[in-house]
């Protein structure tokens, strides 16, 4: 259930055994070979992830901390949170960043009860995923379904080159290979892209040869409405195709619907916290208090600036918006090295103003905020769940985010950065920014006019940035006043579409574990979860490659009879 990154891997691997009959269900559209939409293939992802045809449009989430000690407090505002609805899932619309996380992340998975998931056990599956076009050796795969590569500094735009100099002046070194040894430094971003075209999980794993297998059926535009049970045995799913309800039955059902929709399916089937299920009028099938709990994402804010004309991207070589990033250590007590990650964007949207704005996106990659949750609004399968991330609920996350704004705000004031940027300001991915980023003729006309004005006199540019682009606070405000900085960070922090951990793997004696280390849902039979839901903790990485690794490893477990 779910033809995203994990579902594409599973369909390919499980159908390789001719005696397995595999049905892949996906709510979104197909992306068959030769008919992949241009926006999906594009090296620049902004036109894909803001296309409403490729996402669940009614999904809203909260990101600010909700106080359970003050139930009368005004709830935080809800935000749009793009979740893919297309074959290939997130890999069809994401930023194509292909990294793995820290070895200590996976050792922590094992320590939290996911036996067999330490770094030494998962590295072979990361290598199995990839076909590295640049490097060989013990860290890299050469025969996988997903090509990975980097764009090296000689091809970076002037803004990215200047940022590299600023990083070095701050004491960080250049690292050629992000996915080799885990150490601090800046590097060319590793991307799942070949010859300036995205390679999604659907493109890589559901290739024409795989699609020709007699034992594999791919049913797109198919919405799963519920799970079918015979007692505690899951025996199939209910689905809607073209407005008509239908049922599919199978020996084993695998949920790969993502960390928001997979737990929602379990909850509607009566698997989850008993009190919440009763509140929703749902009969309790298996009381698993961890379903939907401890939701995580990586909190992020940005410090942006106007790019001087010579520093902007020249599209002759690449349409990529990100060329480099920095991994660094906060050095807070008890926190492992490489806990912070700052991406350098050389344009922030597809439109003319987006090409004039660059940013540091400051992300807490080793987050300790684990109080997010997914709950049902009702028992109706057509209602999106209530999703509360509670980002920055851990004080350590807040402190590191504030420190990041100070670091990179101050970096914008250095001579090397002032040679390529002007008018730096604190920024966030607000719904206002998102609305302007939607593809429309109106937005193009508005941003074309604004871009011409921004390239005009400096005084006019400053006025327009302060009145139309900024969210109220200046960089001076947040760098000189800690209360204003904290207020900005708490309000502006958003997730980066790395929802994870709502059906966590764990040990037999862990009451919050939803699945075992083979992905089997505890308390019932015939049902597994294989997606980012099962992560015991979100790794220090963009989550797509950890999901692909997880699907490869669990496919092996299923094929071996585990």
Q: Which residue stretches match the model-derived regions?
A:
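N-terminal redox-cofactor-binding region of secreted/periplasmic oxidoreductases
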Residues: 1-562
């Amino acid at each position: 259930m779910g033809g995203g990154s994990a579902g594409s891997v599973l369909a390919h691997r499980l159908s390789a055994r001719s005696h397995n009959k595999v049905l892949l269900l996906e709510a979104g559209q197909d992306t068959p070979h030769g008919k992949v939409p241009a926006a999906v293939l594009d090296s620049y992802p902004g036109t894909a992830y803001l296309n409403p045809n490729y996402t669940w449009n009614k999904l809203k989430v909260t990101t600010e901390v909700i106080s359970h000690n003050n139930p009368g407090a005004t709830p935080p505002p809800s935000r749009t949170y793009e979740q893919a609805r297309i074959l290939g899932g997130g890999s069809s619309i994401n930023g194509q960043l292909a990294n793995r996380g820290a070895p200590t992340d996976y050792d922590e998975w094992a320590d939290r009860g996911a036996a067999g998931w330490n770094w030494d056990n998962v590295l072979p599956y990361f290598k199995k995923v990839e076909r590295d076009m640049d490097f060989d050796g013990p860290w890299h795969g050469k025969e996988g379904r997903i090509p990975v590569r980097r764009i090296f500094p000689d091809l970076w735009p002037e803004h990215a080159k200047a940022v590299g100099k600023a990083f070095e002046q701050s004491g960080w070194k250049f690292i050629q290979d992000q996915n080799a040894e885990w150490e601090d430094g800046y590097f060319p971003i590793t991307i799942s892209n070949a010859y300036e075209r995205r390679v999604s999980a659907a493109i890589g794993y559901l290739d024409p040869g795989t699609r020709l297998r007699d034992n594999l059926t791919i049913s797109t535009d198919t919405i799963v409405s519920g799970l079918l049970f015979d007692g505690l045995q899951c025996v199939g799913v209910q689905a809607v195709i073209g407005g008509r309800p239908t049922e599919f039955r199978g020996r084993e059902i695998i949920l790969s619907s993502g960390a928001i929709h997979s737990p929602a399916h379990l909850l509607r089937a009566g698997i989850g916290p008993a009190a919440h299920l009763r509140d929703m009028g749902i009969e309790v099938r298996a009381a698993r208090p961890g379903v939907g709990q401890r939701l995580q994402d990586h909190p992020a804010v940005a410090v942006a600036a106007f790019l001087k004309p010579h520093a902007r991207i020249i599209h002759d070589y690449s349409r990529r918006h990100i060329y480099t990033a920095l991994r660094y250590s906060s050095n807070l007590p008890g926190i492992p090295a490489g806990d912070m990650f700052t991406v350098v964007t050389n344009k922030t949207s597809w439109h003319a103003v987006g090409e004039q704005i660059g940013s540091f996106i400051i992300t807490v990659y080793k987050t300790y905020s684990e109080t997010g949750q997914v709950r049902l609004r009702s028992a109706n399968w057509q209602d999106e769940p209530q999703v509360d991330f509670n980002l920055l609920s851990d004080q350590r996350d807040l402190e590191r985010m504030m420190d990041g704004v100070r670091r990179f705000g101050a970096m914008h004031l250095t001579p090397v950065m002032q040679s390529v940027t002007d008018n730096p300001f604190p920024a966030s991915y607000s719904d206002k920014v998102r609305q302007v980023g939607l593809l429309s003729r109106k937005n193009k006309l508005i941003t074309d006019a604004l871009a011409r004005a921004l390239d005009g006199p400096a005084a006019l540019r400053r006025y327009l940035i302060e009145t139309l682009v900024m969210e109220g606070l200046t960089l001076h405000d947040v760098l000189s006043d800690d209360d204003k900085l904290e207020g900005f960070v708490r309000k502006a922090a958003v997730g980066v579409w790395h929802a994870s951990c709502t059906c966590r793997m764990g040990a037999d004696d862990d009451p919050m574990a939803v699945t075992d280390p083979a992905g089997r849902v505890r308390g019932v039979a015939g049902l597994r979860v294989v997606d980012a839901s099962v992560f015991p903790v979100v790794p220090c990485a963009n989550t797509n490659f950890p999901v692909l690794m997880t699907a490869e490893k669990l496919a092996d477990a299923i094929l071996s009879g585990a």
